[in-house]
């Protein structure tokens, strides 16, 4: 059951990221944010299930992303996250659960960067409109 749910959640996150990239091309920021949140929620659920499956395994320092560059771009970051999730799905289907967990964890890091970007943008907009 857990394995089935992990695969469903990863697949759903991939699909939501696809929607977010389409919305980005259409310059529909609200839809980008909504889709990224949905992808993140599904990914967090998958990671929770991974943690239940492998309680003795903790994400290691080698799973962390390199420090972000000064120039952040949403599009390439979403593509990177989606690529990692596709790799996670492939690894999962090949029953390489450790690698699937690692790739999903790394994709999470990219999605957190996107969330941080939009949060900073909202704060900046809030200060300029006050």
Set out the residue ranges of the language-model regions.
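Long, charged/polar, soluble alpha-helical segments
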Residues: 1-130
């Amino acid at each position: 059951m857990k394995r089935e749910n992990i695969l469903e959640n990863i697949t759903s996150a991939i699909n939501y990221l696809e929607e977010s990239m389409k919305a980005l091309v259409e310059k529909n920021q609200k839809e980008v944010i909504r889709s990224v949140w949905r992808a993140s929620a599904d990914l967090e659920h998958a990671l929770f299930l991974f943690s239940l499956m492998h309680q003795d395994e903790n994400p290691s320092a080698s799973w962390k992303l390199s420090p972000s560059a000064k120039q952040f771009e949403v599009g390439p970051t979403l593509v990177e996250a989606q690529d990692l999730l596709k790799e996670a799905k492939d690894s999962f289907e090949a029953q390489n659960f450790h690698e699937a967990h690692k790739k999903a964890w790394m994709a999470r890091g990219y999605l957190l960067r996107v969330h941080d970007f939009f949060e900073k943008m909202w704060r900046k907009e809030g200060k300029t409109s006050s």
